[in-house]
Amino acid sequence: MKKRAKSSPKAEASLLSRVAAALDRLAPPALSQTLPEKGDAFVWEPHLGALTEVAHVASIELPLLKAIENQRDTLIANTRRFADGLPANNALLWGARGMGKSSLVKAVHREVNRGKKSALVLIEVHREDIASLPLLLRLLRGGKRRYLLFCDDLSFDKDDTSYKSLKAVLEGGIEGRPDNVLFYATSNRRHLMPRDMMDNERATAINPGEAVEEKVSLSDRFGLWLGFHNCSQDDYLAMIEAYAANYGLKIAPEELRARALTWAMGRGSRSGRVAWQFIQDMAGELGKKI
């Protein structure tokens, strides 16, 4: 029998270092002891257990968001109530891509804070950090300000159990959701999970009905549902004209519309995102900064 070769001290030290690093990644971070008193926009950094300030939020003025007036009015009313310390609902903005879901959240936050002394704080939570939400709630619970958590493009795939952490935000578990925290999410899916994932849960669960109900009901835990749908040609052109007027693009109306339609045909779709991309191209061509 061959004797096992002895590891060198250097190799053992390297192995221990890798093990320690792996344990550090698995262990929850120590929470920051204090919340920022200034600033109104942050990103949650779970590996630091703290918030990182965003100096400039890329947002546009509310009047430039066309074809979503009903959604705009509903969301701004809900957000104002929350900012004023009144009851408000968590909101799920779902539907067509590029129709202004995330733009609306940021624009509403900006509008609600206009002229306010105590700003509503917007905190972006990345999709991959959903599992750390209970840590964030623990940090915010003692805060004196009001916090709007925002997750863009939220959905869950097969074998993903982080949706259970989201319930801590929507319902709060045994402690209850802090009164100073609200959660907004955008998603292309109304029920946040693909149908095949729910079908698989039904087939393998001891109690199939309860397994699927748990996942479908995740969307039901949002008190406010706002649907976004593909825009018509008239809506698309209204977006183009509003952008062109706002940024002072000097071009004949007939040419603007014709070129905007050609651009949309080349992209194979009409949406707020496509309209903005056309305006960027046109502004560059005209030598205009926006």
Identify the role of each PLM range.
Residues G85-A107:
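Walker A/P-loop nucleotide-binding motif
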Residues K3, H229-I290:
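C-terminal alpha-helical "lid" subdomain
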Residues K10, A50-T74:
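Dynamic helix-loop-helix/coil hinge segments at AAA+ ATPase domain boundaries and subdomain interfaces
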Residues N113-R114, G142, K158-A205:
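Conserved catalytic/switch belt of AAA+ P-loop NTPases
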Residues E111-Y147, S155-D159:
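AAA+/P-loop NTPase substrate/partner-engagement loops
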Residues N70-D84:
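Pre-Walker A adenine-sensing motif
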Residues A203-V216, G223-L237:
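Conserved AAA+ ATPase "SRH/arginine-finger" region at the nucleotide-binding site
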Residues R4-E53:
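Interdomain "pre-motor" coupling segment immediately N-terminal to P-loop NTPase/helicase cores
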